[in-house]
Amino acid sequence: DEAVVHDSYAFDKNQLIPVGARAE
């Protein structure tokens, strides 16, 4: 996935969500 991991968080769809709890 083209998500930028930052501080154990992933930027996806302009939202900050914990890595591992990302919804597809």
From Swiss-Prot:
Cell location: Cell outer membrane
Keywords: Cell outer membrane, Membrane
Keyword Ligase among UniProt keywords: no
Annotated signal sequence range: none
Gene Ontology CC annotation, any one: cell outer membrane
Location, primary (coarse class): membrane
Known role: May be involved in transporting molecules across the outer membrane.
Additional remark text: Its absence leads to imipenem resistance.
Name of the molecule in the record: 29 kDa outer membrane protein
